[in-house]
Amino acid sequence: MKRADFCIIGLGRFGMQVAHSLKENNFTLVLIDNDQHKTNTAAQEFDHVVCCDGSNLTALAELQLEEFSAVIVGVTNIEASIMICANLRELGQKNIIARAKNEVHNRVLRTMGIREALIPEKIVGKNLVIRLIHGMETEIINLGNDILFVRAPVNNKKLFNRTLGEINIREHTNANLISIMRNGKDVVFPLGPNTQIQPGDVITAVCQLSGVNQYLRYINPNDKNKYKASE
């Protein structure tokens, strides 16, 4: 498998939502579940589906999951989730994003060194996919009606030391800039046409779900953390 691929373990509602969103963005996926009915259903839509017990270290090792860009663990059973994540860590996979059933489960996963532990009620599958594509440091809040509150660092050098009036991000992306976090602590608000973007700035903006990828690609055209879809 290519380095840009993703693996999803657990084909419940959350796992399948993430799978569909990643597929829409032209990523190659491997889907895993220990339920034959779920894998049979998923195989009707996806090319690479495996019926496998993720808590079985030997079975996971055969899939070479350490070669994937990231593995999303979406199982709901806490014990199974912990065992799967432990197996993935042992196999050398560092980029693990796991669904947490509650705050206790969340803390346990983070104690294990899991890169991201997410409670689905706080972040929906589509928002997770945006973060997978553009970098997990991107923060997404769904305001409803497909309107997103997006907080992300700016890495486009062409924007540095230029004013918002000169750049006119809204014209290029239809996003409305709200504030800028500078030096990790100083907040620039309100923003005006003479406000400059500087290296290291983190911008908060409001935009539509349909335009969020365009906006994030504009402020981070060569983001080293952004995964690229398979050719």
UniProtKB/Swiss-Prot annotation:
GO molecular function: monoatomic cation transmembrane transporter activity
Domain RCK C-terminal as annotated: residue spans: 134-221
GO biological process: potassium ion transport
All copies of domain RCK N-terminal, residue ranges: 3-119
Alphabetical list of PROSITE patterns matching this protein: RCK_C, RCK_N
Highest taxon listed in the record's lineage: Bacteria
Gene3D superfamilies tied to this protein: NAD(P)-binding Rossmann-like Domain, Regulator of K+ conductance, C-terminal domain
Protein's name in the database: Uncharacterized protein MG323 homolog
Organism field: Mycoplasma pneumoniae (strain ATCC 29342 / M129 / Subtype 1)
